[in-house]
Amino acid sequence: MKLLWQVTVHHTWNAVLLPVVYLTAQVWILCAAIAAAASAGPQNCPSVCSCSNQFSKVVCTRRGLSEVPQGIPSNTRYLNLMENNIQMIQADTFRHLHHLEVLQLGRNSIRQIEVGAFNGLASLNTLELFDNWLTVIPSGAFEYLSKLRELWLRNNPIESIPSYAFNRVPSLMRLDLGELKKLEYISEGAFEGLFNLKYLNLGMCNIKDMPNLTPLVGLEELEMSGNHFPEIRPGSFHGLSSLKKLWVMNSQVSLIERNAFDGLASLVELNLAHNNLSSLPHDLFTPLRYLVELHLHHNPWNCDCDILWLAWWLREYIPTNSTCCGRCHAPMHMRGRYLVEVDQAAFQCSAPFIMDAPRDLNISEDRMAELKCRTPPMSSVKWLLPNGTVLSHASRHPRISVLNDGTLNFSRVLLIDTGVYTCMVTNVAGNSNASAYLNVSSAELNTPNFSFFTTVTVETTEISPEDITRKYKPVPTTSTGYQPAYTTSTTVLIQTTRVPKQVPVPSTDTTDKMQTSLDEVMKTTKIIIGCFVAVTLLAAAMLIVFYKLRKRHQQRSTVTAARTVEIIQVDEDIPAAAPAAATAAPSGVSGEGAVVLPTIHDHINYNTYKPAHGAHWTENSLGNSLHPTVTTISEPYIIQTHTKDKVQETQI
């Protein structure tokens, strides 16, 4: 009975609970829908725009707008604001447009784009800003545009492209920078980070030198037309191994150096029309294995021996389009003829001449080395290595490379590099070879007395250009078509003597010469030092003589200006003269042996001496003055040295 009651209560509870749970779920769903509708707001099209496709496409063109209109539906995927008068894009203007994929702002008057102007556009893949007044690239505004694929900045007065200008949009695949006519500077790192870029337009940007495009490893199409660079040098397209289309039209190109296109292994289309090209280096297009479309028209081609290889190449690889590649401009009798119609029978051509042949070289291991091979610029250069490998400028080797001028460069030589290296120079009339022997020795320690770089005399038999011209006659052509001349012409070999494969050891004669040179240097040094010491001593002696002469002159001047000095010493013990003696000779005759001394004055008191203008000893016994002229002499100075013993009187 109890069990039956429990089962009845359980079924009753379930019957009541299930409707309550169902009603609660329905209420929650209804509330969520109301909240979503309230947050989305009403989907109304702005009055100045036209909307279609359930508000996913909004067009507001040519409405004279000065700012982005309010109330753009949140589900908009395509927004066109072109041809208005918008001058500034403020931050968070499009924050609510999370589904926007295409934003067209071209042909406005936009001068400033604030940082954060495109916040919220997580789905944006195309941004058009062409034909505006931007002077700088708004790099800060591109933040968080993680899905951006296309960016159009064409025809803006942008003056420079700084480093890392687009590193915030690594997803970019198409970048249009054409017609930047105010552009003056492109940084070396301007395109860093754009490893996904497929298309780049730099046409009509007043570019004078090819910018650094190495970071664009995935680039497939490059537009460079309408610029002003007269030369295309090797390395201009370095790193663009994926490039398929290259347009360089109307850029005043007058010279393309050999090996200029060596890195473009994937190139399919090349347009060089409307330039100033008159000739091209031999085998310029040989590395372009996939090239099928070539445009060379509207160039002043000079149809001579340097153009024969191009005529043959056009017939072989582009036989279906004879008008693609222009006509002869010179000489006069060839003017107007298509390049593919130029025949070698009309010219007298000779094999190339090697102007600077390589020389034998002895060098130690782990050093850098070069073997030069200077040739005419319109010829092609290849090197034959000792192991049979043929190396050109386009070849890739870890340590050995062919430079633009034909030089074979070793970044680091090893013992296995020892052998004969042959420079092979080719043009349409034939080829010329020159060989050199490279001897690599093992590096030895503790050898400071001599260098591994030794001069080796090489006897080279050179052939003059006249002999080559006389020896080589035009290669006959068959009726079936032109054949490459280097398959039938004779090789011109410049013989060079080989150096035995011994390690260079310093000889006794070399050591003696080095010692003699050292002795001569020491002698010269000693002579210079001796001359310096002699000049110094001579100057010192002259200075001493001058000093002595000057001192003697000063002493003579002092003696001349001095007067006589009289020193009188008087002994105080001499007795005074008797009065009788003074009167004993009135007639002036003195007594026997009598000495008459002057009266000694009291020198202690100067005033007692001063009144005596005439000394009494100046008169004789007759009363006549012995010195009548000395009556106005000033009184002498009195110097007392001792008051009791001696008195010194000095008259100056």
Swiss-Prot record:
The secretion signal range is 1-40
Extracellular topological segments:
41-526
The main location class comes to: membrane
Return the protein name. Leucine-rich repeat-containing protein 4
Task: Give me the disulphide-bonded residues.
Answer: C45-C51, C49-C60, C303-C328, C305-C349, C373-C423
- Subcellular locations according to the entry: Membrane; Postsynaptic cell membrane
| Record field: transmembrane | 527-547
Give the source species: Mus musculus
Provide the LRRNT domain boundaries.
41-74
The Ig-like domain extends over 352-441
- All ranges on the Cytoplasmic side of the membrane: 548-652
- Its gene is Lrrc4
**Per the UniProt annotation, where are the glycans attached?**
N276, N321, N362, N387, N409, N433, N439, N449
